[in-house]
């Protein structure tokens, strides 16, 4: 029970005596009224706390619906309707006969279920109580009465209406049946009542999942029983905007019997205590105050509704904590404390809103309506990181071909690259090596400039490739055999397996090396030699768009068996030989550099000067000029150099120029790393990579590299050599059993393949017997396993899939992504990544995704929005697989 602010303790003995007499008279009137009501089954809700408590307990489950009855009066929450005190100023205990009569009258009322004169008697008794208590109130300090009255009039009306509803419910029940939890309250007395009410409250909460106002009661029952009632009570007062002094008034009257009962009830109900204080003030409210405070009561109603909504969000967490047994002994936090301290939820709110905004963007794109065509100058050949005109215009210099290097936009594009007019499905390999559809790569300038060198010619609706080049106009195969004859130790397809072709042109050299079981990483810049790399990729020959400029190429150190340059227009001798030093970094110790250029065999003044400078530079690099040979058929010559396999020459040089790199310089670092004019030493430790030449092809494909030792932990948790072997066996099984037969993919027209997240290169190794080549991509934030891939006779590149890949649109027949997107989604948005996938894959091309089930669903939705044909999706144990095929659909709108 709650009282006025400290008034009970400050009264004189006369005032206390008068109050006692008034109480006795009032009790007598109550007994008389009860006797009169015994035949009418009327139970005034404001007479005793026991009757009020019982009435509220029976109607707790209907609080939410009752709170929306449309009246102008403030609608009390459950806490406000739990207990109603009739004697504010009397600290004494109610007579036992009064309580007993009340209980008997309640039972009688429930048995008869008659409600005919309930309203009238309730209002009369309420008026009598109001008159008597108003007289006593005039003797006391009424500082707080107005505030309390504003909120309590509506509460009294609420209790009456709840009681009437209770009687209506009783008429529908069998005679003598009581609502759940009521009987225990009627039989309980004194300290036993809170325990019964606690059980009732828990049962009611279990019965109702939508009960908003009951949220905090159960959570507070055990803390109150362990002596933390004060904290919880204060917390509840703060939540309801009530001063703490009203609670302290209850605690200061602890010597009175009636207060003991009230304290017990407060300990059992916790959150309800402030509502009880509101309840005992109902008798002070007059009809005049009711009509004068309508507007303020409406404001109170809004505040109560807001509090109910806040508690509704907390209910699930509180019930879960109570059910687990973790709620005991924990005081309830106040609304003020929650405002003062930021929670994880509030701190994360802005971030969630940001992500929601991104998610909405994803949803708009995924519905297929937000995809638009790119509006770039490059048109159908758009490469975002190489055609960033804004970044290129800001370059301070183009001396080192900076304008041909990567400059990715800050915001990765989500637009789609349009198709060339008249585009057709690409011609299959090996026919594609000799001819392609003109409309697929509609560029004729190169044919005009290089046609006489047998690079490319226009033949009707085809572009044909005689197989020639600047240095081998009579065909690449003859030139390849010429190099083999010049140096037998080259041993194509055995000792020499992976090469780098710099300035590849249309990549005829690399295209015909397949017949010698050699794979070539061909590169050329996107320059005035129109679409030369695009020609190569359309011919189904591996190539990337790159330039020897100011930064290292995205390859590890000491991985290429041979590097080739046939009039590649690279000034190797300039800048202290910086570009040649980059080749030295990538060339395997003991590997060869083949230089087929005019300075080797012509005697023009310029060529002679270049030859002298080149000879001095290669000597300072300790490269040995193994042979110079001339090809009479083509009228050209080639110089072949070999990189040293030891450091002996480096240590004997008279001049330290170019200098050796510092010991802490990482030769493998290659992602946007500037070039340096220095040399890295050759590894001498027998267990270090580069100290030995790999075993011959094809045995090197499945042989663990010698520098992987058993004490080293592999990517999948096994010792590195066994991890390597296990990965290979795994992918052989997956490819043969699943990819070849069960995912709806026809491999007959698959040639250009990319493994978007290669580890050991096991997927590419498993495709060895197919007529395909695989670009193995090692992500920059993944373990650096790219040297292992090269060691086994495969090739690959470093890349970050949050950026665009350095290749032309419509380059690949199949992309393979093994657990890529789940790792990318923590770093970048998947929508630009999927737009990049759509850019890289040619119409009719395929995509295989293995990933978490939720990622598979997300990717599937985006693919469908792109009008891809999804062949298969399968999930098991939170893992899934998806295969899809790209069509010819393009959006109708542009940026």
Curated annotation (Swiss-Prot):
CDD domains named among the record's database cross-references: AdoMet_MTases
UniProt xrefs under PANTHER family: METHYLTRANSFERASE PMT27-RELATED, SAM-DEPENDENT METHYLTRANSFERASE
Organism for this UniProt entry: Arabidopsis thaliana (Mouse-ear cress)
CC annotations in GO: endoplasmic reticulum membrane
Other remarks in the entry: This gene overlaps with At3g51075, a potential natural antisense gene.
Taxonomy of the source species: Eukaryota, Viridiplantae, Streptophyta, Embryophyta, Tracheophyta
UniProt entry keywords in alphabetical sequence: Endoplasmic reticulum, Glycoprotein, Membrane, Methyltransferase, Signal-anchor, Transferase, Transmembrane, Transmembrane helix
Class of enzymatic activity (EC top level): transferase
GO biological process, one term: methylation
Lumenal face of the membrane: 38-895
Region (Disordered): 43-362
Chain intervals with Polar residues compositional bias: 43-52, 199-232, 243-256, 337-346
Biased composition (Low complexity): 115-127, 176-191
Segments traversing the membrane: 17-37
InterPro entries linked to this entry: Put_SAM_MeTrfase, SAM-dependent_MTases_sf
Family label: Belongs to the methyltransferase superfamily.
Pfam families membership: Methyltransf_29
Highest taxon of the lineage: Eukaryota
Documented EC number(s): 2.1.1.-
Protein name: Probable methyltransferase PMT27
Bias type Basic and acidic residues, positions: 90-114, 129-143, 154-174, 257-320
Cytoplasmic side: 1-16
Membrane topology listed for this record: Single-pass type II membrane protein
Single Gene Ontology MF annotation: methyltransferase activity
Cellular localisation: Endoplasmic reticulum membrane
Family annotation (SUPFAM superfamilies): S-adenosyl-L-methionine-dependent methyltransferases
Keyword Membrane: yes
Glycosylation site list: 145, 375, 709
